[in-house]
Amino acid sequence: MICTVYKSRRKLDTYLFVEKRDDFSSVPEALMTMFGPPQLVMLVPLSKRTSLAMADIEKVRSELKDKGYYLQLPPPKANLLEEHKLSLGIDKYAP
C-alpha cells in the first residue's frame, strides 16, 4: 500500500495521510476546513516500511483501512516550569 502525505499550511507539524493522491473524499469537511489547503509532502510505501518517524505505522495502516485517512498531530509541548516544579517536589495544586 502506498499512501500520500500532506502537511497543513495552517497547523504547524500537522500531517494528513490519505490512500490516494488528491483524494480527500473520506476526510470530513470540517477537518479539511481546519487543515487548510493541503501541501503534498511525499508518497510512502507502507507495505515496505516497518516504522514511521512520528507515528505508529500499525495505527496509520489501520486508520487508512477503516477511515480512509490518518491525521498526525504534533506532539504536546513540554511544560518545562511544571517539570521543574515536580523535580523539586512542589505540588502544582498547592496554594
From Swiss-Prot:
Q: Domain of life of the organism in this record? A: Bacteria
Q: Where is the YcgL domain?
A: 1-85
By its UniProt entry, which SUPFAM superfamilies does this protein fall under? YcgL-like (SSF160191)
Q: Which residues form a coiled coil?
A: none
Pfam families registered for this protein in UniProt: YcgL
| HAMAP family on file | UPF0745
Mind telling me what this protein is named? YcgL domain-containing protein Sden_1630
Question: The organism's lineage?
Answer: Bacteria, Pseudomonadati, Pseudomonadota, Gammaproteobacteria, Alteromonadales
